[in-house]
Amino acid sequence: MSDSETEETKISTEPVENAWAMKIPSFKPEDNPHGMVEESSFATLFPKYRERYLKEVWPLVEQCVAEHHLKAELDLVEGSMVVKTSRKTWDPYIIIKARDMIKLMARSVPFEQAKRVLQDDIGCDIIKIGNLVHKKEKFVKRRQRLIGPNGATLKSIELLTDCYVLVQGNTVAALGPYKGLQQVRDIVVETMNNVHPIYNIKALMIKRELMKDPRLANEDWSRFLPKFKNKNISKRKQPKVKKAKKEYTPFPPAQPESKVGKQLASGEYFLNKEQKQAKRQQERSAKQADAAKRQDERRNKDFVPPTEEASSSRKRSSAENASSKVDVKALKAKLLKANKKKV
């Protein structure tokens, strides 16, 4: 082993401070001089409305993949795109990158952006958001939050993550560096889980400023990040009739009395069939008699005459008679008192 090779191994085994800042080592034709053993191919379908655009840009697609010794085919009858390796292909992973490129193009990503995925330090992520929200109205509202007014929110996400983001249908297609793809996925998933994207955008902006200060490299940044509390806490619906809680007892509840037990207590258990039937008939007739009595009382209420009040003339005469009566004793006492005063 030469000195240069030993130096490279030493460098690779040293601890890394920031793994995201590391440059991905390039894969060269010298690393795989024998090429591929077998041909590999990937195909993807595209919607009808993309047919016209793909037909226009397909010569550029063929030219782009030919640089990496790949072949591209467009089938307008079946509505599919195919990428294949050739005998000259030396990069084993380039076919995966080409597959991602045609997937992005099928999802309305323009060719100028999709071809960037063929670079080593660029990746793509297709985030499925259709099954994250059950109600369609909520889904449309939260997806619109991700785009923002005039696409302002989406543009700010792109600037902070250095990724190209396209929201369409039930998916979000992201294209950019791997660190940015992680951030985009977090923002998208949290937005669909009813966390407004502005909170995550604000946190990313603060982190970007903190990264500029080398003194804070080994410190916890959570004290600088904003903490948002959910104000819309859904309260549990209270029942209309609340049952009073019974006092706790360590003993099990008493066993309910069975039908046989009730019959034994009343003595009905020892009666024969005819006696039981006679008792039931007696109870039934007693109930019928009681019901008939109540019915008669209710019917006879209409025939009871109302109580007549005394007429006004009678009242007046009785009042006059009461006033005409003179208390003789009181009058005598009054006269005697007056005579004494005179004397």
UniProtKB/Swiss-Prot annotation:
Residues 232-343 are annotated as: Disordered. Keywords: Coiled coil, Developmental protein, Nucleus, Ribonucleoprotein, Ribosome biogenesis, RNA-binding, rRNA processing. Residues 270-302 form a coiled coil. Residues 271-302 have a biased composition (Basic and acidic residues). SUPFAM superfamilies: Eukaryotic type KH-domain (KH-domain type I). Its main location: nucleus. GO terms for cellular component: nucleolus; nucleoplasm; small-subunit processome. GO terms for molecular function: RNA binding. One of its GO terms (biological process) is rRNA processing. It is found in: Nucleus, Nucleolus. Residues 125-193 form the KH domain. Residues 232-245, 331-343 have a biased composition (Basic residues). InterPro entries: KH_dom (IPR004087), KH_dom_type_1_sf (IPR036612), KRR1-like_KH1 (IPR041174), KRR1-like_KH1_euk (IPR048550), KRR1-like_KH2 (IPR048548), KRR1-like_KH2_euk (IPR048549), rRNA_assembly_KRR1 (IPR024166). Belongs to the KRR1 family. Required for 40S ribosome biogenesis. Involved in nucleolar processing of pre-18S ribosomal RNA and ribosome assembly. Binds to RNA. Required for female germline development, cell viability during eye development and for survival of dividing cells and epithelial cells during early wing disk development. Monomer. Component of the ribosomal small subunit (SSU) processome. This is KRR1 small subunit processome component homolog. The lineage of its organism: Eukaryota, Metazoa, Ecdysozoa, Arthropoda, Hexapoda.
